[in-house]
C-alpha cells in the first residue's frame, strides 16, 4: 500500500539538494525516492561523484540549442550559481545531455535541387512496361513545367525552379519513339483485310525452260506461272467443233480465186492451232505450279489446325479454372 503524504520523503529533495550538490542532482534524487516509495534515498555524496565523472567525460563546450539554458563557463565550479532564489528561476549549468548538432527543424531542405523525372522514361530505363497510351491513339500533349511547392517549414525561405539534367533529353527522345511504337501497335490491333492475290507462298518452283518457251508468245514477256491469271472466258471449256465435210472441187474450177481463199483458210487454221496450243501449254505450266503450291498450303493448314486445337485446349483449361474471359 502507498504511504500517507506525511510519511513520504519531504518535498525539498525534489526542488533542491544539499549544499554543494549540482542543481539537478536533488531533483533526480527526489524523483527516484518518490518512485521507489519506502526505499531510502541514496547518499548525495555518491550522486555528486557520479555527476562529476559524467561531466568529465563530456566535452568542455557543448553547443547549445534553441530553447535550452546556456551553460556557464567551463572553469566555474559545478555548484556555483549566478543568483539566489529557487533553481527553477535562476540560470546555471544544465544537468543532462547536450546537443552537438543543429536541430531537425533548423535544417534547410534543398527544395530547389529536386529533379523531376518522367515516369515513362523511368520505367523504360528499368525495363518495365510503359504506361498505356491515351484513348484515341493520340500522343499525350507535353506537360508544362512544374514548379515545386515550397515547404511551410521555417527553414524554407525560397524555392528555385527545377533543373533539368542533360541525361533526360535522350530519355525523352526514346519515350517519343516508344510512343510512336505504341501507336503503331494500337493501329495493328484490328488488321486490315489482305488481298489474296498479293499473298505469296514461300516455295521453290523451277519450271522447264522449254515449257516456258512454248508457253510464251514470241516477242513478248516470258510467261510467269506464279503471277499469271486467266480470265473466266479462257478457263471455260471449249466446245469441240465438227470438221466440215470436204468438198471435192474439180480441177478445171481451181482458179486463182480458189487458191487465194484456200491459202487464207490455211493461215487462219494455223493461227488458231498455235493459239490453242499456247493456251494449253500455259495452263499446264500454271497447273503444275498450283499443284505444288496447293500441297504446301495443305501442310500449313494441317499445322495451323493442330496449333488451333492446342490453343483451344489451353483456353478451355483456363476458363475451367478462372472462368470465362
UniProtKB/Swiss-Prot annotation:
SMART domains per UniProt: BRLZ
CDD domains cross-referenced by the UniProt entry: bZIP_HLF (cd14695)
PROSITE patterns linked to this entry: BZIP
Tissue note: Expressed in the suprachiasmatic nuclei (SCN) and in most peripheral tissues, with a strong circadian rhythmicity.
Record PTM Phosphoserine, positions in chain: 86
Main location: nucleus
A Gene Ontology term for the protein's cellular component: RNA polymerase II transcription regulator complex
UniProt similarity note: Belongs to the bZIP family. PAR subfamily.
Region (Leucine-zipper): 283-297
Pro residues bias locations: 129-153
Described purpose of this protein according to its UniProt entry: This transcriptional activator recognizes and binds to the sequence 5'-RTTAYGTAAY-3' found in the promoter of genes such as albumin, CYP2A4 and CYP2A5. It is not essential for circadian rhythm generation, but modulates important clock output genes. May be a direct target for regulation by the circadian pacemaker component clock. May affect circadian period and sleep regulation.
Induction: Accumulates according to a robust circadian rhythm in liver and kidney. In liver nuclei, the amplitude of daily oscillation has been estimated to be >50-fold, and 2-fold in the brain.
Bias type Low complexity, positions: 71-80, 88-98, 154-171
Biased composition (Gly residues): 17-28
Coiled-coil stretches: none
Disordered as annotated region, ranges: 1-98, 124-203, 230-256
Other facts noted in the record for this chain: Mice deficient for all three PAR bZIP proteins (DBP, HLF and TEF) display a dramatically shortened life span and are highly susceptible to generalized spontaneous and audiogenic epilepsies (due for example to the noise of a vacuum cleaner) that are frequently lethal. The down-regulation of pyridoxal kinase (Pdxk) expression in these mice may participate in this seizure phenotype.
Subunit-level organization: Binds DNA as a homodimer or a heterodimer. Can form a heterodimer with TEF.
Origin superkingdom: Eukaryota
Compartment(s) of residence: Nucleus
InterPro entries: bZIP, bZIP_sf, PAR_bZIP
Region annotation (Basic motif) ranges: 257-279
Name of the protein this chain belongs to: D site-binding protein
GO biological process: circadian rhythm; liver development; regulation of DNA-templated transcription
Residue intervals of the bZIP domain: 255-318
Gene Ontology molecular function terms on file: DNA-binding transcription activator activity, RNA polymerase II-specific; RNA polymerase II transcription regulatory region sequence-specific DNA binding
